[in-house]
Amino acid sequence: MYIKNCLYRGCLAHIRSWYYDTEDELDAKIDELNGKKKTALSKFFDFVRTGTARPNAKSEQDTEIDGAKYKVRYEYYPKKVSENSRLFCKKMVQANKMYRKEDILKMDSQVVNAGWGLNGADTYSIWLYKGGGGCHHKWRRKTFKFTGVGKGDTKSPLAPTISTNKGEKEGYRVRNPKEVAMRPKDMPNQGFVNK
């Protein structure tokens, strides 16, 4: 009911920034209220999505050491695209979301960048291969350290971050496959699969 009232009062843009997990539902409601019919082109573009980001939800990579709460989140980086960038990369940069590892892994089984998987498959490991072979993006890791009361808001621009090295010196070690922090362009065969 709150969302419905908000739609009529014109505050949807504000709500959407908080409710990423209901993005598809809200898009459908907007289309319904606007009476939009999907064209063939818009149906194609629906295969490019940015996934659901829940940066303040619990992650397997979160931990507490000596009363300090540590969290690792990831952003699609660099925050720039070119004229030749893929639609997926453009949408990821534009969305400017902060993801947990689990959010990104969930995209591996969803159609978010159709056709870039092995043999043209619609799904593949976004965690390892981002926008697909030749992509210029990677997952940039951000380590947050919260002290005091509360859970810590990773979406806040004032959220305290520390370097990965500092976190490791304090006992917070998170290990990922090396490909997570690599651009597919810098991988063997530029991230493409040899057949």
Where are the regions a protein language model picked out?
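Domain-core detector
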Residues: 1-134, 139-195
